[in-house]
Design a protein with these regions (language model features):
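Junctions where cytoplasmic loops transition into the N-terminal start of transmembrane alpha-helices
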Residues: 7-11, 161-164, 233-237
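Conformational gate/switch positions in structured elements
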Residues: 20-21, 27, 170, 216, ...
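Long, contiguous internal "core" modules enriched in hydrophobic/ aromatic residues
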Residues: 44, 54, 59-227, 239
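Final/C-terminal transmembrane alpha-helix of multipass membrane proteins
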Residues: 232-251
Length: 264
């Protein structure tokens, strides 16, 4: 358990920084990004997301401080002493843990809520996008810990947790598609983009099949000791979570009220 606790906060900071860099490079007016942090608009998902991304950093740094990797301890004795003092105080440990859980959940759900706020895209016009992105994020996170964990008990625990997340994710996908198909003609046509349209192969094969169903079968067999644990299942889950976001974003951009409504 110690290995993952020491590695994950630093890895999270590195991956989050890469994502922040990608967001910055995607901005059209990069010199104006600082304006997001001089105000807070409770009704704006973009404002919430900006502040969540900022607040996650100190929470992760706190988690990193509580479980410093050995190379950092050896190189910086003063930080090691500070970490030891912080770890001896249960209140600080509890605060860091709760902060990471709350901010992690908000970070996972806000992207889906942000997309669902764009009513001009029929595919995104669903209240299930937020929970779907959250559960998908939890699933890929469990898969990542499962992948890097060195302790056998930890691998089994994370595989069981991931199986639960994958089952919920599959249910949410079914409800998401069913909601679109039972709505207006515009929503039905937008659903067809991922069911039998240009994004169907990526969605059905790489997200549902290789990203959820097959890993769920493999990990179910592994936790029941039918087959040995393998890195293939968590890798497929992580890849499936990434492709899910690509499909939702690009298929959503391809869905339009006017274009679909005026189609013959």
């Amino acid at each position: 358990l110690g290995c993952s606790c020491a590695l994950l906060p630093g890895l999270s900071i590195a991956l989050l920084s890469l994502g922040m860099l990608a967001l910055f490079l995607d901005l059209e007016h990069r010199r104006q990004f600082w304006r997001l942090y001089v105000t807070f608009k409770p009704a704006s998902p973009m404002s919430w997301g900006s502040w969540i991304l900022l607040l996650v950093y100190p929470a992760l740094l706190g988690a990193l401080l509580l479980r410093l990797p050995e190379p950092i301890k050896a190189a910086f004795p003063s930080i090691k002493n500070l970490a030891a003092k912080a770890f001896e105080k249960p209140g600080i440990v509890k605060l860091v843990g709760i902060s990471n859980m709350v901010l992690g959940a908000l970070l996972g759900i806000y992207t889906g809520i942000l997309l669902s706020s764009f009513g001009a895209r029929p595919l995104w016009n669903s209240s299930l996008l937020g929970p779907l992105f959250l559960v998908s994020g939890l699933s890929t996170a469990a898969a990542l810990v499962h992948l890097i964990a060195g302790d056998p008990y930890e691998r089994v625990l994370l595989a069981k947790a991931d199986n639960g997340f994958l089952s919920i994710e599959l249910l949410l996908l079914v409800l998401f598609v069913t909601g679109l198909l039972s709505s207006t003609a515009v929503h039905i046509e937008s659903a067809r983009l991922i069911l039998d349209g240009p994004y169907a192969p990526a969605f059905l094969v790489f997200v549902v099949g290789l990203g959820i169903v097959i890993p769920l079968i493999i990990q179910s067999l592994a936790v029941n000791h039918r087959i040995p644990h393998t890195a293939a299942a968590p890798i497929m889950v992580i890849a499936g979570g990434f492709i899910l976001r690509l499909v939702i974003v690009y298929a959503g951009q391809a869905s339009h009220w006017i274009r679909i409504a005026s189609a013959p």
